[in-house]
Swiss-Prot record:
Name of the gene encoding the protein in the UniProt record: AGL12
Protein name from the UniProt record: Agamous-like MADS-box protein AGL12
Gene Ontology annotations of biological process type: flower development; positive regulation of transcription by RNA polymerase II; root development; vegetative to reproductive phase transition of meristem
A Pfam family hit: SRF-TF
Tissue expression as described in the entry: Preferentially expressed in roots. In root meristem, expressed in external cells of columella, lateral root cap and atrichoblasts. In mature root, expressed in the central cylinder. Expressed in leaf vasculature, young floral meristems and nectaries.
Residue intervals of the K-box domain: 95-185
Domain MADS-box: 3-57
Remaining remarks: XAANTAL is the Mayan word for 'go slower' in recognition of the retarded root growth phenotypes of xaantal mutants.
The organism of origin for this protein: Arabidopsis thaliana
């Protein structure tokens, strides 16, 4: 049975909305970086959070340089510095009431504290379904971040071990060469002593000539 198209709509819960924004924003910036590396593309991403906070990414150079390039390509920035300045002004976050952002952060902190207490068997009461789903999303995000950090640490340790292996191999090779040189020197010295102590004069006993 074919699945129906999922209708996208605004997330009403502010904490849930903030968590989704953070996860999707991280994924979007990661995909942009990957596309830039794989295809040698120049990518610029500008994101404003619901609270008006600016997040930007310029894979090559700066965002101002990309804006200049964009204005030149579209014909709006030829010899016109005011057009670029206007575009840069539009990237500045709007002046919003900070109380809304503070309230969202307070709700998120309260939810996280309640979730931590619930996980360790504390808390005053059970969590409802919406809170449990939100806590599950938090845990999935944390596990993903922990696994990513763990992989980075493991790769660094593997590279460090490879470097140490290379140093040990070079040291072992150097020591073997020195041992071989010392052995050759000892053999040469022994041969020299033998040639000095054991001479064979060409003399014949006088008894041979007695009749």
């Amino acid at each position: 049975m074919a699945r129906g198209k999922i209708q996208l709509k605004r997330i009403e819960n502010p904490v849930h909305r903030q968590v989704t924004f953070c996860k999707r924003r991280t994924g979007l910036l990661k995909k942009a970086k990957e596309l830039s590396v794989l295809c040698d593309a120049e990518i610029g991403v500008v994101i404003f959070s619901p609270q008006g906070k600016l997040f930007e990414l310029a894979t090559k150079g700066t965002m101002e340089g990309m804006i200049d390039k964009y204005m030149k390509c579209t014909g709006g920035g030829r010899g016109s510095s005011s057009a670029t300045f206007t575009a840069q002004e539009q990237l500045q976050p709007p002046n919003l009431d900070p109380k809304d952002e503070i309230n969202v952060l307070k709700q998120e902190i309260e939810m996280l504290q309640k979730g931590i207490s619930y996980m360790f068997g504390g808390g005053d009461g059970a969590m409802n379904l919406e809170e449990l789903l939100l806590l599950e999303k938090h845990l999935e995000y944390w596990i993903s971040q922990i696994r990513s950090a763990k992989m980075d640490v493991m790769l660094q340790e593997i590279q460090s071990l490879r470097n140490k292996e290379g140093v040990l191999k070079n040291t072992n090779k150097y020591l073997l060469e020195k041992i071989e040189e010392n052995n050759n020197s000892i053999l040469d010295a022994n041969f020299a002593v033998m040639e000095t102590n054991y001479s064979y004069p060409l003399t014949m006993p006088s008894e041979i000539f007695q009749f």
